[in-house]
Amino acid sequence: MEVLQQLGTYYSQNGGYVLQEFYRHFLMSVYGVLFAAIVGIPLGILIARYRRLSGWVFAVTNVIQTIPALAMLAVLMLVMGLGANTVILSLFLYSLLPIIRNTYTGIISIEHAYLESGKAMGMTKFQVLRMVELPLALSVIMAGLRTALVIAIGITAIGTFVGAGGLGDIIVRGSNATNGTAIILAGAIPTALMAVIADLVMGWLERALSPIKKKKGNFIIADRKTTSI
């Protein structure tokens, strides 16, 4: 109970600071994933077209995933210095694998009949991609973005070690303080809530964008232009 009282007191006295760091934490996470999506989605489409490249691309992105986050930040800090940009670049690198993998999987798993129908209607390769493949693969791509964002929120918490701020800054302050359990919780609880809410929202978007929806025990094709081909 004493810890809860201390936690409530901390929030009442430092609510503005916590909100500021929450916002900063969220923005860094989103920027890292957004930049990874800008690169990763086209790259996933490319290796779905030229599958010989997939082994090399996945090998590189898998190696990146094996590097501890703190070590990655330390290396990038030597190049980019302290600050949020170092964290965003780190998040960009860690977010590539789930985004590329899900884009690749979503594209190659589309039934060949849909592609042939598009070609039979006189669509160009780009039109087939834009009007058939991407809409049908969108829910799978969203699943990759969902995974990447949740991972990014967790990694951003250690960005405080390179001067990036965020909720990790509150956690570190608590770990350095005497009887700082309440301060640690003041940073850890919003971080966990952010990850849970992001996962729920992205999960809802993933289901909403799925071309196959479940209704009354039966699977039906969603009402989408691409599925009418």
From Swiss-Prot:
Induction: Repressed by OpcR. The keyword ATP-binding does not apply. PROSITE patterns: ABC_TM1. One of its GO terms (biological process) is transmembrane transport. Residues 22-202 form the ABC transmembrane type-1 domain. It is found in: Cell membrane. Pfam families: BPD_transp_1 (PF00528). It is a multi-pass membrane protein. Its main location: membrane. Keywords: Amino-acid transport, Cell membrane, Membrane, Transmembrane, Transmembrane helix, Transport. The chain crosses the membrane at residues 27-47, 55-74, 78-100, 148-168, 182-202. InterPro entries: ABC_transp_perm/SBD, MetI-like, MetI-like_sf. GO terms for cellular component: plasma membrane. The keyword Transmembrane helix applies. The complex is composed of two ATP-binding proteins (OpuCA), two transmembrane proteins (OpuCB and OpuCD) and a solute-binding protein (OpuCC). Belongs to the binding-protein-dependent transport system permease family. CysTW subfamily. Involved in a high affinity multicomponent binding-protein-dependent transport system for glycine betaine, carnitine and choline; probably responsible for the translocation of the substrate across the membrane. This is Glycine betaine/carnitine/choline transport system permease protein OpuCD. It comes from Bacillus subtilis (strain 168). The gene is opuCD.
